């Protein structure tokens, strides 16, 4: 079974760390990336040159899979969640995908429901997130499924857009069952698909691309 990986904060120095954390150097950052590339046999590792990163795009069956890197390029300034180069790359990849579904993964949550301004798009780069979501919406890029992690537990959310379009996020779970925030909250009732916390869990997409209108279940 092919395994495709990404890192999050505890793989990248420590809790909520990104870019070059205080007390570390560029050499340390390169070392973290080097160990990662030696540990995971991914299809690519970012720019594959001195610019670094570990993002990539691949294909699993009929589906495109895009994994972004929201740790390496952050500078501590708003708008640096992916960095300019990776953002341009992501926009190109989204428009080049040809499968019925695009699984787009980010190690932190796409929505703000659980993160509440913590180590998230909502805190560091809401403008960049809006660029991505608006591109998907205006270019009518079909079948985008958002997956995420970071916060302990497994939750699914509908992300409504101003024009009535919806994106769907699947926080993929905590295999180790570490307790985190509540799986459900009353204020999420209109947007939440499911919620699990304080137990073992994993997530799985089942895709049937043989139909005239391909289907996915989660």
Where do the PLM segments sit?
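Metal-dependent phosphoester/phosphodiester hydrolase catalytic core
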Residues: 1-218
């Amino acid at each position: 079974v092919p395994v495709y990986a990404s890192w999050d904060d505890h793989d990248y120095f420590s809790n909520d760390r990104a870019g070059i954390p205080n007390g570390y150097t560029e050499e340390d950052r390169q070392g973290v990336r080097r160990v990662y590339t030696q540990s995971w046999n991914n299809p690519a590792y970012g720019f594959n040159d001195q610019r670094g990163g570990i993002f990539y795009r691949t294909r699993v069956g009929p589906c495109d899979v895009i994994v972004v890197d929201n740790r390496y390029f952050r500078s501590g300034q708003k708008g640096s969640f992916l960095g300019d180069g990776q953002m341009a790359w992501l926009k190109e990849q989204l428009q080049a995908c040809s499968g019925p579904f695009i699984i787009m993964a980010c190690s932190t949550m796409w929505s703000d429901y659980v993160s509440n301004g913590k180590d998230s798009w909502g805190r560091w780069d809401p403008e960049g997130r809006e660029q991505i979501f608006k591109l998907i919406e205006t270019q009518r890029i079909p079948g985008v499924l958002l997956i995420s992690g970071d916060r302990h537990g497994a939750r699914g959310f509908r992300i409504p857009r101003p024009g009535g379009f919806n994106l769907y996020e699947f926080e993929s779970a905590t295999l180790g069952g570490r307790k985190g925030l509540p799986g459900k909250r009353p204020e999420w009732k209109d947007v939440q698909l499911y919620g699990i916390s304080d137990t073992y869990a994993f997530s799985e997409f089942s895709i049937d691309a043989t139909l005239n209108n391909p289907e996915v279940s989660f």
